[in-house]
Structure formats: structure tokens, C-alpha cells
Amino acid sequence: MKTLLLTLVVVTIVCLDLGYTLTCLNCPEMFCGKFQICRNGEKICFKKLHQRRPFSLRYIRGCAATCPETKPRDMVECCSTDRCNR
């Protein structure tokens, strides 16, 4: 009986889809130390630099379902591994 129970537990663990959750940096500073666990469907980390005026950059980092659109005076980098948007 114990063997059957143990077998059922092992099969249940193996068959469960534990899933994978992506972790991305999420803060507006140049040097970032805050992390965000991405929601279901968000499979991309991004870093967006926006030049507001000469010598003034705004950093935006986070999770996304798709790579954000690049607009004038923006630079966007996308990646798909943990904490890759440094």
C-alpha cells in the first residue's frame, strides 16, 4: 500500500506542469536592483531608453508579452532569459 501511494505521489509530481516564471528587472534607474516576476503570458524582458532632451535619458524596464514599439528618440532591447534586461 505504501509503495502504491509513493508511486502515485511521484507520478503526480512528474505529470504536473509546474511552469516557468520569467524574472525581469523593473525600475527606472540606470543601475537597477529591483526584480519583477512576470505574469502569465509575459515572456519577454525589455529595456527602453527614452531621450527626453539632450543628455537626459529615461530608463524603463519590465516584462511584456511582446517587444515594445520603438518610437522616435527611443532605444528598445528585448530578451527572454531571467534578469537579462540590465
UniProtKB/Swiss-Prot annotation:
The keyword Disulfide bond applies. It holds the Pfam family Toxin_cobra-type. The keyword Signal applies. Gene3D superfamilies: CD59. Residues 1-21 form the signal peptide. SUPFAM superfamilies: Snake toxin-like (SSF57302). GO terms for molecular function: acetylcholine receptor inhibitor activity; ion channel regulator activity; toxin activity. Keywords: Acetylcholine receptor inhibiting toxin, Disulfide bond, Ion channel impairing toxin, Neurotoxin, Postsynaptic neurotoxin, Secreted, Signal, Toxin. It is found in: Secreted. InterPro entries: Snake_3FTx, Snake_toxin-like_sf, Snake_toxin_con_site, Toxin_cobra-type. Disulfide bonds join 24-45, 27-32, 38-63, 67-78, 79-84. GO terms for cellular component: extracellular region. It comes from the Eukaryota. Expressed by the venom gland. Binds with low affinity to muscular (alpha-1-beta-1-delta-epsilon/CHRNA1-CHRNB1-CHRND-CHRNE) and very low affinity to neuronal (alpha-7/CHRNA7) nicotinic acetylcholine receptor (nAChR). Belongs to the three-finger toxin family. Ancestral subfamily. Orphan group II sub-subfamily. This is Probable weak neurotoxin NNAM2. It comes from Naja atra.
